[in-house]
Amino acid sequence: MEATLEQHLEDTMKNPSIVGVLCTDSQGLNLGCRGTLSDEHAGVISVLAQQAARLTSDPTDIPVVCLESDNGNIMIQKHDGITVAVHKMAS
């Protein structure tokens, strides 16, 4: 699985508008990251996804957390126990 995850991280970073990507487990353990998102962000990203999920009563509704700034967006979503964050530059 680790090699597959590493390949997905590399493939994601090939998009010129993406400057960072991070995958974390539900405990906030960094599973892999590239670019602007690093190990120090893993816990916060995991907690943001968990808290967003608590805002809905529908367990099939998987929220996307979007942090917006003048410099770009960080989109965070949890799937099957893995939370993915993508940092995309503003176009």
From Swiss-Prot:
Homodimer. Part of the Ragulator complex composed of LAMTOR1, LAMTOR2, LAMTOR3, LAMTOR4 and LAMTOR5. LAMTOR4 and LAMTOR5 form a heterodimer that interacts, through LAMTOR1, with a LAMTOR2, LAMTOR3 heterodimer. The Ragulator complex interacts with both the mTORC1 complex and heterodimers constituted of the Rag GTPases RagA/RRAGA, RagB/RRAGB, RagC/RRAGC and RagD/RRAGD; regulated by amino acid availability. The Ragulator complex interacts with SLC38A9; the probable amino acid sensor. This is Ragulator complex protein LAMTOR5. It is found in: Lysosome; Cytoplasm, Cytosol. One of its GO terms (biological process) is cellular response to amino acid stimulus. Belongs to the LAMTOR5 family. One of its GO terms (cellular component) is cytosol. The modification N-acetylmethionine is found at M1. As part of the Ragulator complex it is involved in amino acid sensing and activation of mTORC1, a signaling complex promoting cell growth in response to growth factors, energy levels, and amino acids. Activated by amino acids through a mechanism involving the lysosomal V-ATPase, the Ragulator plays a dual role for the small GTPases Rag (RagA/RRAGA, RagB/RRAGB, RagC/RRAGC and/or RagD/RRAGD): it (1) acts as a guanine nucleotide exchange factor (GEF), activating the small GTPases Rag and (2) mediates recruitment of Rag GTPases to the lysosome membrane. Keywords: Acetylation, Cytoplasm, Lysosome. Its main location: other.
